[in-house]
């Protein structure tokens, strides 16, 4: 399976284009948002035969259903739909998106796997069993991790298996600025040439978390073996600080799992800008 990446910049650009085609004003209201979720758990067998392998798709999609600001609600739904299901669903109703996405997944599974499965069945030895690699699954589960004043942190967890030694999983975060109706990027939070200094802080925090004192010791443990340790746009804000979230293979091998590095605000004061959202979190 190919690793699934979500580009925050691509999400911002695609959704912004949709939103500004609908409305050219930004409302500063944080929205009094209320949320619900749409849940799907469907299993579909090859050839509709329960004796044959199947795919399973699980969706738990959290989304705003009520707000004092309809444009804010629509904006958030566009971003959430984009990051969970892809740009082509932007502008559709959440219920229709989830239903269509699940249907497309099942249809594609059968279209791709049934011919190969039939060929394997035809060519197998009389007592052989066609491999379990035809049993696929996919889950997309999202929730609101934090909603406070002008900030909403939205988390999406993906998990997928398409044959092979193991499945793939990853988590993606959107830190929504509700006044601007778009996700925050590192450039919105930090000032100046922050990259090098922030990289040093991440290394130092990783060393502290792992009770070692050198970069080499971290590298011996497996850190930085699959990618450079540097600030990532996949982060989330909390009252404790900023957490940089590295999915499997970003900086470590699969066996080490994802890596979270939380830097307290007090350690980054010299790098932080004057974004009011940070002030609200630190109060």
Could you say what each language-model-derived stretch is?
Residues 22-283:
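Compositionally biased intrinsically disordered regions enriched in Thr/Gly
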Residues 1-34:
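Bacterial Sec-dependent N-terminal signal peptides
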